[in-house]
UniProtKB/Swiss-Prot annotation:
Coiled coil: none
Membrane topology of this protein: Peripheral membrane protein
Family matches, as InterPro entries: ATP_synth_F1_ATPase_gsu (IPR035968), ATP_synth_F1_gsu (IPR000131), ATP_synth_F1_gsu_CS (IPR023632)
GO cellular component, one term: proton-transporting ATP synthase complex
Any one GO molecular function term: proton-transporting ATP synthase activity, rotational mechanism
Protein name: ATP synthase gamma chain, chloroplastic
Gene name, Swiss-Prot/TrEMBL: ATPC
Post-translational modification: Disulfide bond; Cys-240 and Cys-246 are known to form a disulfide bridge in the dark which gives rise to an inactive enzyme. Activation can be brought about by a ferredoxin-dependent reduction of the disulfide bond in the light.
Domain of life where this protein originates: Eukaryota
Disulfide bonds: C240-C246
Note: Alkylation of Cys-130 results in the inactivation of ATP synthesis.
Residue numbers spanned by region Disordered: 17-36
Name of one Pfam family that matches: ATP-synt
Length: 364
């Protein structure tokens, strides 16, 4: 009996360490399970969802890039094809206007008045996802408005484009004369509607100067917001306010256009150079004032149409560049997420193998 009792007690004491080890092993496994299986599974699902989302976004940005590339080619051709006519028309008008400066001729669109109020046309895009295209233009508009306020000159805005319309509607402190929505393809009819409003404002003397702020198309990777004096048409520049101060913008496009060797060039340091005389082949049977009156509406329409075309080409080029960068970034993000997914999946498999090995060792 004593031996039996001592043997039973020795067996019970023999099993105590094993029982302790087996009860301690599960907590280790239990602490490992939440950190591997549930959380890692959640991470894997999240990574899979993110990879799928990035793939879908990449498809969208790639498609938008291709669409913008197809459209910008047509817009670029319209800009390039329209520039010779517009520049030649401006050159002819400059020459005629300069000849008429010495004569007592009343041409409303060339009449230089003391500037009390300026109409600022702001040409923006209709859509977003084009990088900083619209923001850069609107910042330049705000800068020009601040300059006019500093000079003490009143102003009003003619907004063209849905993005600009939304921007100025949210700022009721900025006076806006009219809002115009842009189109996917600017036409002469659309430009004529804007020109009629500008013409009535200037001829009725509601404004004394009309400036046009738009984005000039330079190349597929570069576009510059520029200010262009639309009215009055004056090759001499230096349009002044009631105090005699020049109200022309420092980077005014029109008053930096001069002729050099018979071609229009841009001279920042010169307002005007000697203009060559008309070719002897050109002969005008009518009075120059009548011709100027007939050409000025065409000039107004062509300049507005050109600004709309250049703005559209710049917007499409900016969108193509932005979507190209977005596609590249999505591709890089997809690679990074795939690497993280593979690492998490490998860690999950390794953890499961370690659990199996630990369980097998515990059963031995």
């Amino acid at each position: 009996m004593a031996c039996s009792l001592s043997f039973s007690s020795s067996v019970s004491t023999f099993h105590l360490p094993t029982t302790t080890q087996s009860t301690q092993a599960p907590p280790n496994n239990a602490t490992t399970l939440p950190t591997t299986n549930p959380i890692q599974c959640a991470n894997l699902r999240e990574l899979r969802d993110r990879i799928g989302s990035v793939k879908n976004t990449q498809k969208i940005t790639e498609a938008m890039k291709l669409v913008a590339a197809a459209k910008v080619r047509r817009a670029q051709e319209a800009v390039v094809n329209g520039r010779p006519f517009s520049e030649t028309l401006v050159e002819v008008l400059y020459n005629m206007n300069e000849q008429l400066q010495t004569e007592d001729v009343d041409v409303p669109l060339t009449k230089i008045r003391t500037v009390k109020k300026v109409a600022l046309m702001v040409v923006t895009g209709d859509r977003g996802l084009c990088g900083g295209f619209n923001n850069m233009l609107l910042k330049k508009a705000e800068s020009r408005i601040a300059e006019l306020k500093k000079l003490g000159v009143d102003y009003t805005i003619i907004s063209i484009g849905k993005k600009g319309n939304t921007y100025f509607i949210r700022r009721p402190e900025i006076p806006v004369d009219r809002y115009f929505d842009g189109t996917n393809l600017p036409t002469a009819k659309e430009a004529q509607a804007i020109a009629d409003d500008v013409f009535s404002l200037f001829v009725s003397e509601e404004v004394d100067k009309v400036e046009m702020l738009y984005t000039k198309f330079v190349s597929l990777v570069k576009s510059d917001p520029v200010i262009h004096t639309l009215l009055p048409l004056s090759p001499k520049g230096e349009i002044c306010d009631i105090n005699g101060k020049c109200v022309d913008a420092a980077e005014d496009e029109l008053f930096r256009l001069t002729t050099k060797e018979g071609k229009l060039t841009v001279e920042r340091d010169m307002i005007k150079t000697e203009t060559p005389a008309f070719s002897p082949i050109l002969e005008f049977e009518q009075d120059p004032a009548q011709i100027l009156d007939a050409l000025l509406p065409l000039y107004l329409n062509s300049q507005i149409l050109r600004a709309l075309q250049e703005s559209l080409a710049s917007e499409l080029a900016a969108r193509m560049t932005a979507m190209s960068n977005a596609t590249d970034n999505a591709n890089e993000l997809k690679k990074t997420l795939s690497i993280n997914y593979n690492r998490a999946r490998q860690a999950k498999i390794t953890g499961e193998i370690l659990e199996i090995v630990a369980g097998a060792n515990a059963c031995v």
